[in-house]
Amino acid sequence: MFDAKAFLADVPHLPGVYRMYDAKNTIIYVGKAKDLKKRLSSYFRSQLASKKTEALVANIHHIETTITHSETEALLLEHNYIKENQPKYNVLLRDDKSYPYILLTKHQHPRITSFRGSKKVAGEYFGPYPNAGAVRETLNLLQKLFPIRQCEDSYYKNRSRPCLQYQIGRCLAPCVEGYYSQAEYDNQVNLVRLFLQGKDGQVVEHLVQKMENAAQELDFEAAARFRDQIQSVRAVQEKQFVSNERLDDLDIISIAYQHGIACVHILFVRHGKVLGNRSYFPKVPNNTDLTELADTFVGQFYLQMNQHRTIPNQIIIDQPLSEATALANVLSEQAGHKVSIADKNIRGDKSRYLALAKTNAEAALTLQLKQDTHIRQRYDSLKALLNLAEIKRMECFDISHTMGNQTVASCVVFDENGPLKSDYRRFNIEGITGGDDYAAMEQALLKRYGRHLEEEKIPDIIFIDGGKGQLNRALETFASLNVSWDKRKPLLIGVAKGVERKAGLETLLISKWDKEIHLPPDSPALHLIQHIRDESHNHAITGHRKKRQKAFTESGLESIAGVGAKRRQALLKYLGGMQGVKSATLEEIQSVPGISKQLAEVIFDTLQHS
């Protein structure tokens, strides 16, 4: 029993962070406070604020505190602890992806392209965009409006005549001299810059001036080109919501919460334009109040989830934040510019955007609730079928190869909410007879389970995509494991496809019963098994294809003396892949940077006689 009175006697009235541990020495909650003594004392009153707090306090074994210089420092430390430990009773945002940007490169003839990751490439970055699809859509639009290049620098350097993009009017062909001047290209680059900054009006004004100048000089062909550009830009403007207010960089957040599931929807506005939107479904402990959810989400989203995320000038949210001022100060320091947080009195076009975010949040939550209902029905059906009290984690294995070559095994994981893609794994299978699926499965299982596993990582069910032979090999492999965790816990099930290999005709081979089960095609349990089996199959095939493609592109070059990884990469890049290398002339191979005349002859002769 935790002695709260003795513990609180030594806690100071200072700002800091506290970490609550259970009997297994696992951190179950992380919090911060302006006054540690006051905050921690509130957990041990006779009447607690919520059932969530009651459950938390009942599991406390001991508490550790860290004193900080300020509330701001405590806020940062709190989110670092949450990210590192993923405590059970904290709201957890499960999203660690970098966000894509549009990059205008620093070059004599800049290119526009998508970019993801640390901003190490020289140039101007616009974004972030919520997903790769939004970037592709914008790049396609830019290519139609402004004819500047999107090709790789290696492709650009090796052109001797304009490519198809020039012929269809989507590039000025700066790679070849004599088609357009540097000034004309720079002008189009500047228009792209203005457009991405949301200054559409300036783009139109500039093009109108250019059109009028061309007409006065009787260059009617150029005037017609500018006229077409003006019409295209105006057509884009008409499709967009045009605000009378000055809307710079905003993130607009709305939270919908129902039946223990939360949806946080964000509209990303940059330079007055909505770049896109995204819905998040954080893991929320039961009976969490909305203020805590809003506080934790905003803190995690901007402070801990991704170092490349751009922090906007203003964050608008439809739920009150208890720590808005402290959070705004921290974000301002992180961003290098003033960041404000508004959670009330939102008016004008910002109010309209917030209403749009709310509509999207509610719609996404409704859809998620329906999906969760289907998932629960399927899990309940499978639990009843197998006579299991609970199913918290399932894993499924599949093997993929082409005639025994480039064999890959996949392992996919489902938890109570469906696919847990962050835990998916692939295994390269080596040292076996080609086409021996039993040996491949054994190797995959040994790689996956022949090591220490935390209790929560031990699956309740392991599905093996295959018949009785595969299942028996899997059982033998498990029997041979020498591990500290309970290897008897997982129930192994073989999923045989049947003679016609059609969905709905699967046979289940249940290891603990040593019998076969045929489920009706409309069985929710069967649908869940088909889902995890298909996920595993697709994951294996994707991995196998990547491995096969890599072997194909590298074959023929690895064996040549003097051709290492860098030269091999240069040959493939400059000559357009392995097919381009094989069909290249001696002179073309010699023109690749880093390839001498002597080495080019060796490469050419080797490929011609291979």
UniProtKB/Swiss-Prot annotation:
The keyword Hydrolase does not apply. Residues 201-236 form the UVR domain. The keyword Cytoplasm applies. InterPro entries: GIY-YIG_endonuc, GIY-YIG_endonuc_sf, GIY-YIG_UvrC_Cho, Hlx-hairpin-Hlx_DNA-bd_motif, RuvA_2-like, UVR_dom, UVR_dom_sf, UvrABC_protein_C. Belongs to the UvrC family. NCBIfam families: PRK00558.1-5, uvrC. This is UvrABC system protein C. It comes from Actinobacillus pleuropneumoniae serotype 7 (strain AP76).
